[in-house]
């Protein structure tokens, strides 16, 4: 196994470690253990105390670090996961775990902006020869495609679960990068799993695009028995950016892509699907589903489900929200996703973008949700392209051309039914991607990527090559959560863009990775800045 460990300091004595332990416990830090922050994929950091809507205006670049990951197609780095209180041989550390598409994992000391260890996975999969050296296609890049998930197993002890390109589940010690146990096959090799989830000792993922000739399935890996369960929708794949979400009863949710919707034949394309692990057999079984009333119309126009679906409680009931490239939000009661006919949502919003019915526009990525101090439930959605001309919010921050973040409030209408009301629309963002929220501040960003999908033509390359040439740079924005007012932006500090990645936030820091392998850490003015731009050398 090709593994490099950067030792930099000698180990301290056991007595010194014991002495530091009480201090480490007293200074409890927040975690960000999964893509989207939690198993429900809310993208809400509940434990942020350093950055506030009053102090975020002074946020600065604390550091940036160049990682040696090689891009594949348009993929590069995935959103960092944050282990806030890791016990290491040299004392407690806050560590960021970053996955790279080329089967790489990096551990970074966030206080210093330096690399602690890195691991490149061995592989049982042999890649066939490719022209161009970046994998098969934008949809099927090959490599590691699922953001890992972390688990705190005891105070100071964290485990990282990772699925490598060959489909094997890896279990790593976050402090050292060492394998805790041998890898075990979870999903077929050379597929395209999305961000991992972990609930009650079970790892979940979903796959899409039929990459590597593999079926599009939900997958579950039971850690206690090492049994794998799967369930197939019989049609379109599931491609929620931040992975499937899990409800309080263990049901796993993801929307399926373009495909036939014929439930009588167990074919569930163009639908929101809930599956659940059988506790005896460990198999995944269909629990419920919802298909929009215009599912066939959406399928013909490639407007399929395209976003991870946050789950939350509202007045004693559990709901999820989701969206698609059509650009409206569905509110679904998880006790009966689509009612008796599987076609009736609890509520659906009007269209708020994609008036042109363009399959490259609409909602992509993930929604977010949070609750303010007054108990109001908020829903956030990124979108690509202009705002719909018939959609209005009470607060709007200028013309939207390339994309924005839209906010909705969940309230009861006159009949007592839950309803999503528009609250605000942010400033224009170049291809707005999934927001995260912490302590009254929404962190949103424009990815800067070119989303134009076309064949080669005179003067323009096609496919990934053309999109890479035309992409610009990402910009992160801090917005007041209740109004959408811009409080801060990264401006031109980020020099590259990203594709199908995201933000992470914890303990006064906001992280974003880019196509060129650079990881940026912006943070509170009270935190020390240790800018690092040179590639980190292994030793």
Where are these regions (language model features)?
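Blade/loop signatures of beta-propeller domains
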Residues: 27-62, 81
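C-terminal segment of classical bacterial N-terminal signal peptides
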Residues: 15-23
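Polybasic, low-complexity, intrinsically disordered segments
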Residues: 22-27, 536-539
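General structural concept
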Residues: 78-84, 96-98
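Extracytoplasmic/lumenal domain signature
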Residues: 49-74, 87-92, 103-142, 150-158, ...
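Bacterial N-terminal signal peptides that target proteins for export
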Residues: 1-12
């Amino acid at each position: 196994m090709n593994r490099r460990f950067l030792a930099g300091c000698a180990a301290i004595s056991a007595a010194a470690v014991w002495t530091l332990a009480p201090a480490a416990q007293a200074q409890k830090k927040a975690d960000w253990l999964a893509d989207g922050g939690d198993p429900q994929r809310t993208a809400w950091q509940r434990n942020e105390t350093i950055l506030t809507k009053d102090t975020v205006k002074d946020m600065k670049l604390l550091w940036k670090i160049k990682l040696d990951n090689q891009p594949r197609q348009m993929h590069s780095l995935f959103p960092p996961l944050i282990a806030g209180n890791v016990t290491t041989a040299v004392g407690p550390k806050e560590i960021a775990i970053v996955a790279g598409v080329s089967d790489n994992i990096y551990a970074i000391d966030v206080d210093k902006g330096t690399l602690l260890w890195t691991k490149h996975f061995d592989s049982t999969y042999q890649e066939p020869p490719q022209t161009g050296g970046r994998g098969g296609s934008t949809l099927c890049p090959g490599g590691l495609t699922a953001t890992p998930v972390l688990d705190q197993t005891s105070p100071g002890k964290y485990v990282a679960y990772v699925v490598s390109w060959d489909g094997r589940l890896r279990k790593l010690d976050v402090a050292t990068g060492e394998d805790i146990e041998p890898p075990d096959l979870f999903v077929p090799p050379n597929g395209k799993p999305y961000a991992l989830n972990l609930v009650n000792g079970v790892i979940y993922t979903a796959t899409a695009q039929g990459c590597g000739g593999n079926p599009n399935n939900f997958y579950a890996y039971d850690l206690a028995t090492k049994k794998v369960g799967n369930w197939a929708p019989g049609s379109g794949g599931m491609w929620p950016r931040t992975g499937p979400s899990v409800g309080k009863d263990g049901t796993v949710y993801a929307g399926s892509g373009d495909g036939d919707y014929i439930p009588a034949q167990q074919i569930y394309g163009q639908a929101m699907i809930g599956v659940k692990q059988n506790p005896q057999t460990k198999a995944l079984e269909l629990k419920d589903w919802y298909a929009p009333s215009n599912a066939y119309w959406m399928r013909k126009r490639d407007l399929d489900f395209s976003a991870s679906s946050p789950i939350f409680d509202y007045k004693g009931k559990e709901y999820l929200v989701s969206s698609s490239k059509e650009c409206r939000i569905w509110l679904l009661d998880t006790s009966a996703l689509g009612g008796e006919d599987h076609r009736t949502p609890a509520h659906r919003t009007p269209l708020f973008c994609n008036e042109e019915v363009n399959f490259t526009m609409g909602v992509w990525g993930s929604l977010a949700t949070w609750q303010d101090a007054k108990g109001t439930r908020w829903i956030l959605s990124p979108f690509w392209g202009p705002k719909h001309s018939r959609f209005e919010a009470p607060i709007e921050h200028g013309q939207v051309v390339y994309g924005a973040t839209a906010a909705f409030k969940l309230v009861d209408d006159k009949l007592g039914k839950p309803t999503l009301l528009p609250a605000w629309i942010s400033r224009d963002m170049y291809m707005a991607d999934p927001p995260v929220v912490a302590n009254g501040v929404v962190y949103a960003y424009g990815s800067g990527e070119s989303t134009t999908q076309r064949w080669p033509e005179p003067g323009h390359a096609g496919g990934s090559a053309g999109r890479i040439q035309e992409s610009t740079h990402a910009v992160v924005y801090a917005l007041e959560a209740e109004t959408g007012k811009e409080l801060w932006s990264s401006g031109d500090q980020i020099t590259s863009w990203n594709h199908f990645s995201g933000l992470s936030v914890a303990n006064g820091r906001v992280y974003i990775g880019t196509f060129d392998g650079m990881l940026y850490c912006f943070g509170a003015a009270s935190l020390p800045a240790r800018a690092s731009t040179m590639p980190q050398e292994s030793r």
